[in-house]
């Protein structure tokens, strides 16, 4: 990684504005999944050990520039204190005189959690005045919120105009793992692209066709490719305006010597429910009033075999509607193949794929689970991320 990290700067006695991703799911004021809080702990602990005054900033939910009581970060600050076993103070605002007083009273190793930065309309507009207010609280900016790195916001990018800016450990690991996958991958390198829509994955497919040895397609977006080959797909999801693009991608793969894998059989249903009747049919035999909802057993075997023989696998997007049990076997099978593959480095691209390996209890068998769905997707598209570009070079 060619960006400075917290290892490269002197932190003792410094006020550090650390942007973290504490955007955790909440229900009735309780945190239902604290993965993101735990992911930030190594950076926070390091800052504390180095004698910094640690000021933590995050968003939670989408309050759209106004105060929404149930989106306050108070429960997060409480839980953070429990996890660290130390006192964590919480401000009622994210800047201003009251916050400045709290910062002035901090000792080395103290932690202060600011209020939800998205309570202020200037945050998502990357407003320079708000960025200056944030910067006024600190001596150094640390970005450890990879999940928000694709956003040019006041607390993720704008603040870096006014302070030295470095990466936290979580950000550093994401950039190293994803960066190596794209610039210097171990081979064979396989990308598994699933999810519902082709339009969401156009950029990533196009960018990866130049880099991978194998491209595996699954999920709802597969049916646009199936239709592009001239097969009937019944009521399956399809983007007719993307059929020509699908043809172009398949031709490009051939031209570049990329093995392009598509479902050979699928699970079909007439209704979306937990108790749905399903059938397995070959890809060219989907009846007109049925819909494809998962990859079939023959496809699972082929995909598992490709995975097993790969050195690096990047997975972005499920193989079917994994939230419903009858349609979850394809996604589970891909997860299982990754869990069982020896000598294969697996990178799970955040979002639904991360939720799936979590749901199936396979998370600890994956080499790297990205903490950013949208951010990892944009990184995989070869885009520059504002929250990364703004960091100081080594």
From Swiss-Prot:
- What GO terms fall under cellular component here? cytosol
Catalyzed chemical reaction(s): (2R)-3-phosphoglycerate + ATP = (2R)-3-phospho-glyceroyl phosphate + ADP
Q: Where in the cell is it found?
A: Cytoplasm
Q: Provide the alphabetized UniProt keywords.
A: ATP-binding, Cytoplasm, Glycolysis, Kinase, Nucleotide-binding, Phosphoprotein, Transferase
Name the positions where ATP binds: 201, 292, 323, 350-353
The UniProt entry's GO biological process terms, in alphabetical order, are:
gluconeogenesis; glycolytic process
**So, what pathway does this thing act in?**
Carbohydrate degradation; glycolysis; pyruvate from D-glyceraldehyde 3-phosphate: step 2/5
Q: What does the record give under GO molecular function?
A: ADP binding; ATP binding; phosphoglycerate kinase activity
- Which superkingdom? Bacteria
Q: Which residues carry this modification: Phosphoserine?
A: 183
EC id: 2.7.2.3
* Enzyme category, top tier: transferase
Gene3D superfamilies recorded: Phosphoglycerate kinase, N-terminal domain (3.40.50.1260)
Spell out the subunit comment.
Monomer.
The UniProt family comment states: Belongs to the phosphoglycerate kinase family.
* Name of the protein described by the UniProt record: Phosphoglycerate kinase
To which species is this protein native?
Bacillus cytotoxicus (strain DSM 22905 / CIP 110041 / 391-98 / NVH 391-98)
């Amino acid at each position: 990684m060619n960006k400075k990290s917290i290892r490269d700067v002197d932190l003792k006695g410094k006020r550090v504005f650390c942007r973290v991703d504490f955007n955790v799911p909440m229900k009735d004021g309780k945190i239902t999944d604290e993965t993101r809080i735990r992911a930030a702990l190594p950076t926070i602990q390091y800052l504390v050990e180095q004698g910094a005054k640690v000021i933590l900033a995050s968003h939670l939910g989408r309050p759209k520039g106004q105060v929404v009581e149930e989106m306050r970060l108070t429960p997060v600050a409480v839980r953070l204190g429990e996890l660290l076993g130390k006192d964590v103070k919480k401000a009622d605002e994210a800047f201003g005189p009251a916050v400045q007083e709290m910062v002035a009273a901090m000792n080395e190793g103290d932690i202060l959690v600011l209020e939800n930065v998205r309570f202020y309309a200037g945050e998502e507009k990357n407003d320079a005045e708000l960025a200056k207010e944030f910067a006024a609280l600190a001596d150094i900016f640390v970005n450890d919120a990879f999940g928000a790195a694709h956003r040019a916001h006041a607390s993720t990018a704008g603040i870096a105009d006014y302070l030295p800016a470095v990466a936290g450990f979580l950000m550093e690991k994401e950039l190293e793992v994803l960066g190596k996958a794209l610039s210097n991958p171990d081979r064979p390198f396989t990308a598994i692209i699933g999810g519902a829509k082709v339009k969401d994955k156009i950029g990533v497919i196009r960018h990866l066709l130049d880099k991978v040895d194998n491209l595996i397609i699954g999920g709802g977006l597969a049916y646009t490719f199936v239709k592009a080959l001239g097969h009937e797909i019944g009521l399956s999801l399809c983007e007719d305006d993307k059929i020509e693009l699908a043809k172009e991608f398949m031709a490009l793969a051939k031209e570049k010597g990329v093995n392009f894998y598509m479902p050979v059989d699928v699970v079909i249903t007439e209704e979306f429910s937990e108790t749905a009747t399903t059938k397995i049919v070959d890809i060219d035999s989907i009846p007109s009033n049925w819909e494809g909802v998962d990859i079939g057993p023959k496809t699972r075997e082929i995909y598992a075999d490709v995975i097993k023989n790969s050195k690096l696998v990047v997975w972005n997007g499920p193989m079917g509607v994994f939230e419903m049990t009858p349609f979850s076997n394809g996604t589970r099978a891909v997860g299982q193949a990754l869990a069982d593959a020896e000598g294969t480095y697996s990178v799970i691209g955040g979002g639904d794929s991360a939720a799936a390996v979590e749901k199936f209890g396979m998370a600890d068998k994956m080499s790297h689970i990205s903490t950013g769905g949208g951010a990892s997707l944009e990184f995989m598209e070869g885009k520059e991320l504002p929250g990364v570009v703004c960091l100081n070079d080594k």
